[in-house]
Amino acid sequence: MKRERHQDVFTERLPAKAAQDAKQLRKLAGDWLKLRRADAELSQADLAARLGLKYYTFISQVENGFSRVPTEIMGAWARELGLEQAAFARHLLMYYEPELYRLLFGAESK
């Protein structure tokens, strides 16, 4: 069964009362990444292979909030998901560094 691709994958915002706990924010980012991977119809193993990662379990670690997408492969990760690189990086910054995101783009920016 083919999954319907989400129309605007960058419209999500952090919940207004989201705890600024890094683990919780990484989990929210991981949930978003998992949806994008599903939209691209890739398994964790497929994505890991395309990114040149030795272990596909790293994808699971990121999607479950135990790790972050490394900056060095962020562009490649975006490409493999069919997303624009700068928008992908900006969206992840919202979760990984919310205060920096706010300073750069303002509180109401998406």
Language model: regions and residue ranges:
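Core residues of bacterial helix-turn-helix
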Residues: A40, L51-G52, V62, L81
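Key DNA-contact positions within bacterial/archaeal DNA-binding proteins
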Residues: A45, Y56-T57, A86
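DNA major-groove recognition helix of helix-turn-helix
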Residues: V62-E63, I73, L92
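A short, Lys/Arg-rich alpha-helix, primarily the initiator
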Residues: R3-D39
